[in-house]
Amino acid sequence: MTITAGGIDLERVDYKGLAYYRHTAWDAVKHGVFTRHGGVSEAHWASLNVGGANGDDEQAVRVNHERMYEALDVNADDAVTVWLVHGVDTIVAHPPTEGQRWLAKADGIVTNQKDLPLVMRYADCVPLLAYDPVEEVIALGHAGWRGTVNGMGASLVQTMQEAYQCKPENIEVVIGPSISPENYQVGEEVVEAVHAYYGDASDLIMRDPEDGTAYFDLWSANKLDFERRGVRKTTVMGICTYENTQDFFSHRGEQGKTGRFGVVMSL
């Protein structure tokens, strides 16, 4: 099945019970935005939970990772990731040393190395997938509200520029499944942070006309962050995790009792 979002085609691929989305124009990149289907986890982690710090059985999570990598035909032993800390640091990836795939505390990873899969985990926060087809560089980021109001997207672009001489106009970005604007209620602390970083981009905050409750548009905010850094091709998939818990894990939609879905990119 293929869906069109922002002018690009996204294919939903089914593989041995797993289901994931891929950008049809990124044939040079093995990549997938995985749903929660096709794993072995049970209860509220059912079934392709790839988060290891939420109470799920460790062996089940390990099997889920292996199934995910098999679906993309990448080597599980080569995959690397980071400890997500809701910041804006981006690192340049290197192969795992002595089996240690957790490279650092960060929310962004960049590489131009082939056969070095990047993987991250999500459940409402925004997956940021970036690819420069000219310099053959990939990047993967994680943006909650803190990352969004402190420049996670900008951090990815800057690291791609500094490490690999990427030009922003050549970088293509996909903003993956995450909580939608109409479901992301926030407090005044977040509203102030949005205005501090984005200035007069008032359309990023929506107010309930009756009670004044604020809602934050993470999708448009991250897209704007990339655009301000010179990125011309940013596509929002437009899939809300909160409203689609049958396909994706959602921290808010499932009151914190949930797993994490995976995103993988590899050259």
Where in this protein do the model-derived segments appear?
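Active-site microenvironment for binding and transforming phosphate-containing groups
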Residues: 1-267
